Amino acid sequence: MHSTSLSLAQVDPEILAAINKESERQQFGLEMIASENYTSKAVMEAQGSILTNKYAEGYPGKRYYGGCVNVDTVESLAIERAKKLFGVQYANVQPHSGSQANMGVYLAACKAGETILGMDLSHGGHLTHGSPVNFSGMLFKAASYKLDPETGRLNYDTIRATAKEVQPKLIIAGYSAYPRTLDFAKFKEIADEVGAQLLVDMAHFAGLVATGHHPSPVPYADYITTTTHKTLRGPRGGMILTNSEEKAKTMNSRIFPGIQGGPLEHVIAGKAVAFGEALKPEFKDYSGKVVSNAKVLAEELLSAGFKLVTGGTDNHLILVDLSDREITGKLAENSLDEAGITVNKNTVPNEKRSPFVTSGVRIGTPALTTRGMGPAEMKQIAKWIGQVLNNAEDAGVKNRVHEEVKELCKQFPIY
């Protein structure tokens, strides 16, 4: 007979050992991947709850399974909190990921084979914005806009010209590695000129939008997608927002029964908790510090002689361009990892190297800010990054920095 009351230590010590090692890695290292964060114990408690046992195909009040009264309450709370957080009329909290949220919108706004226009992956876009290896590039005719080769910024005149040339049905405004504010009014103007709908994928900066530290896309976008982790600091998942009743009905049907079956109600519970946390004044203060920490870090890296894409940042992330140095993005990532600093290799505009090697690294401040780190720590971390990248093959330097990183981390426990 299967016992439901045994602990993880009793049932699967191998998995527990891996979890404990990961806990140690997170506690004693500096997490600087821009898309990662530390969610709260409350979110994890909700996500690890008994709700994982419940199937609930459909939407609150209209399920295809019985026994959904309590998960209806949970999902309804998540929806209402999301609507309040972003000032929208309709929200779908069921997408399992940001990618599935995007897929739901594409299927709502376009037919297979029609044209979509998004930021080029190598210039800071996301796989789901039209990459040929992704469903977005397989199911749709994907065109892309790129960054200005001189400034490293978006050039809206160029985007307009591209849109007029390719005549997309959907324009995607969003990124995975762009350190500047997006001008949604200009994107909307371009979309209107070519008769396209506008999707804003705010997965990276949703937490900043929620707190007024980034302009809101709500007045301009037909659809808005986001992940619920990253700067929102919730569980890993996705969400779609809109102010159109008609579009809400379409997007809901594209998520279920279109591309998903049963929603993950335990994850939706975690989303609801995270949205509730984000509605509190403390979260607004946190988001402001995410941005200010990124600016300090950028200034320090510039002072240390590093080249940054666009020369700085307006948001939570920094893109370091190493193309003028001998070191590759891959070596930089590995060397920093050996020193207890986790970043990710990233392509830069006009990339000459393979995406598996790259000429840049992407660095973010959301997780460090969650730990309570501020400007003083950013200055010290910038020094460590410089020391490691300037001595990438020197084990002595990396070991010394790693020990110093551990000491700093002890002062800022995660939980």
UniProtKB/Swiss-Prot annotation:
CDD domains: SHMT (cd00378). Its cofactor is pyridoxal 5'-phosphate. Gene3D superfamilies: Aspartate Aminotransferase, domain 1 (3.90.1150.10), Type I PLP-dependent aspartate aminotransferase-like (Major domain) (3.40.640.10). Pfam families: SHMT. (6S)-5,6,7,8-tetrahydrofolate binds at residues 121, 125-127, 246, 354-356. GO terms for cellular component: cytosol. Its EC number is 2.1.2.1. The keyword Iron-sulfur does not apply. GO terms for molecular function: glycine hydroxymethyltransferase activity; pyridoxal phosphate binding. It is found in: Cytoplasm. The record marks 229 as: Plays an important role in substrate specificity. It comes from the Bacteria. The modification N6-(pyridoxal phosphate)lysine is found at residue 230. Keywords: Amino-acid biosynthesis, Cytoplasm, One-carbon metabolism, Pyridoxal phosphate, Transferase. One of its GO terms (biological process) is tetrahydrofolate interconversion. It catalyses: (6R)-5,10-methylene-5,6,7,8-tetrahydrofolate + glycine + H2O = (6S)-5,6,7,8-tetrahydrofolate + L-serine. InterPro entries: PyrdxlP-dep_Trfase, PyrdxlP-dep_Trfase_major, PyrdxlP-dep_Trfase_small, Ser_HO-MeTrfase, Ser_HO-MeTrfase-like, Ser_HO-MeTrfase_PLP_BS, SHMT-like_dom. The keyword Manganese does not apply. Pathway: One-carbon metabolism; tetrahydrofolate interconversion; Amino-acid biosynthesis; glycine biosynthesis; glycine from L-serine: step 1/1. Belongs to the SHMT family. Homodimer. PANTHER family: SERINE HYDROXYMETHYLTRANSFERASE, SERINE HYDROXYMETHYLTRANSFERASE 1. Catalyzes the reversible interconversion of serine and glycine with tetrahydrofolate (THF) serving as the one-carbon carrier. This reaction serves as the major source of one-carbon groups required for the biosynthesis of purines, thymidylate, methionine, and other important biomolecules. Also exhibits THF-independent aldolase activity toward beta-hydroxyamino acids, producing glycine and aldehydes, via a retro-aldol mechanism. This is Serine hydroxymethyltransferase. It comes from Bdellovibrio bacteriovorus (strain ATCC 15356 / DSM 50701 / NCIMB 9529 / HD100). The lineage of its organism: Bacteria, Pseudomonadati, Bdellovibrionota, Bdellovibrionia, Bdellovibrionales.
